[in-house]
Every structure is written in C-alpha cells, then in structure tokens.
Regions:
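Conserved micro-motifs of the catalytic ATP-binding
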Residues: 24-27, 66-69, 145
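Detector for a conserved hydrophobic position within an alpha-helical segment of the HATPase_c
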Residues: 161-162
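Short conserved segments within the C-terminal catalytic ATPase subdomain
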Residues: 48-58, 91-93
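A conserved beta-strand-to-alpha-helix junction within the catalytic ATP-binding
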Residues: 30-42, 98-101
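Conserved catalytic submotifs in the C-terminal HATPase_c
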Residues: 55-65, 100-102
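Short helix N-cap motif at coil->helix boundaries in the Bergerat
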Residues: 34, 129-137
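Short beta-strand/loop element within the Bergerat-fold HATPase_c
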Residues: 92-105
Length: 188
C-alpha cells in the first residue's frame, strides 16, 4: 500500500512538471539506486504480467554504483518501458530486466556525448516486435499503436533520459521481440 501512495505522489509531482513545459527543467539530481527504482516498478506491473501467466526475470549487476538522477523521472521512464514490454508479451511470456555497468561505451561514435562510464538497463520482451514503419516514429509525440494510448510515453521517456545525459537504443525483430537499452552516465 505504501508503494501505491508513493506512486500517486510521484504522479502528482510529474503532472505539475508537465503543466509548464516551457519552463527550463530544474534537475533535482540525487544519488539514486537504479535497482531500487526498477524493483518499485516491477511491483506495480507484476500483477498485470501474472494475469497473462508471465513473469519477470531479473538479472542485476551487483557492481552498479548509485547514479545522480531524478528518481521520480527515472521511475516514469522505466514504468513506460516495462508497461510496454508487459503489454507486448504473449500469454506465458517473460520480460527480462537486466543491468550492467560499462566502463566503455562500445557503440561510441565521434558525435556521441555519452560518458564512457555508464550503466545499462536492458528490457527484453518476447512479443511480436516493432515494425520498421513503427520504429521510425517510436519517439514521435502523440504517435501510438494502442487504442487507449496517448503517444507520449516513449517521447517523454526519451526526453527524460536525454536530460540525464543518457541514450535509449531500441532493437526489434518481428515475431521475436524487442530489446530496449537505457544508457545512463555514472558521474566519476
């Protein structure tokens, strides 16, 4: 029950932030344990996945340090991503959540600004995958493939991750599933 109350408070804070999108973001970054953030989200989504006779598989890297982040904003990102993975999963499907500590970003390009020290949160589902046409519009505000979707989840998630100086990478194969990786810098 305490987590539900915390989530209502968090949503209220996020709504207040979204009401004035023209104001520059005030980054309320504090030391944050990413595993704690993920566990709170999984508690919220566990029932939905269990109704589909599915389960979460968690593989956490114990060496991950705390990061400087806005915990409420990261909860919103991972709630969006985990909820999408749960919705995409077939009956009896598994949603895998893994974390890893990287000391070098192996996909680095010259124009890439990601810190060489980062954590990666990987969310993998076994759904139908994302079509190429949908992939091109994935982060476009108000684009949705859901009947009741607003089309804001992925756009807001990307904006939050970028405000944390991170990146989101999405790979998907039709009829196999989708992998979403969120890279967040570790401030050394």
């Amino acid at each position: 029950m305490e987590i539900v109350i915390q989530e209502v408070d968090r949503i209220n804070r996020l709504v207040k932030k979204m009401m004035d999108l023209t104001r520059p973001a005030l980054n309320d970054f504090k030391p944050t344990n990413i595993h704690q953030v993920l566990e709170e989200i999984l508690i919220l989504e566990k029932g939905t996945l269990e109704m589909k006779e599915g389960a979460f598989v968690q593989v956490y890297d114990p060496s991950i340090p705390t990061i400087k982040a806005n915990k409420d904003e990261l909860k919103q990102v991972f709630l969006n991503l985990v909820k999408n993975a749960v919705e995409a999963s077939p009956k009896g499907g598994r949603v895998r959540i893994s974390t890893q500590y990287n000391t070098d970003y192996i996909f680095r390009k010259k124009q890439d600004t990601l810190s060489p020290h980062n954590i990666v949160v990987k969310i993998t589902d076994s759904g139908l995958g994302i079509t190429n046409a949908t992939m091109k519009k994935l982060f476009t505000p108000f684009f949705t493939t859901k009947k009741r979707g607003t089309g804001l989840g992925m756009a807001v998630s990307l904006k939050i991750v970028e405000n944390h100086h991170g990146k989101i990478k999405v790979t998907s194969e039709e009829n196999i599933g989708t992998v979403i990786q969120v890279f967040l810098p570790v401030n050394k």
